[in-house]
Curated annotation (Swiss-Prot):
The lineage of its organism: Eukaryota, Metazoa, Chordata, Craniata, Vertebrata. Conjugation of reduced glutathione to a wide number of exogenous and endogenous hydrophobic electrophiles. It comes from Dicentrarchus labrax (European seabass). It is found in: Cytoplasm. It is an enzyme of class 2 (transferase). This is Glutathione S-transferase 6.7.
């Protein structure tokens, strides 16, 4: 890691942290999902603040 970027290490594979979630999900997919696929994760970006429900 010459540039000092955050890294994730699993066995002999060293990954950038931005790819770690996708890597873990592909390796351990039977244990569940790490990346949500529902539209609720975009709620704060898609719904104007005045129209949001608490």
């Amino acid at each position: 890691n010459p540039r000092g970027l955050p890294a994730f290490k699993h066995g002999n594979x060293v990954l950038n942290e931005s790819y770690a979630x996708m890597y873990l999900e592909s390796q351990f997919g039977s244990x569940g999902x790490l990346i949500p696929d529902a539209d609720v994760i975009y709620y704060n970006w898609k719904v104007p603040e005045g129209e949001r429900h608490d």
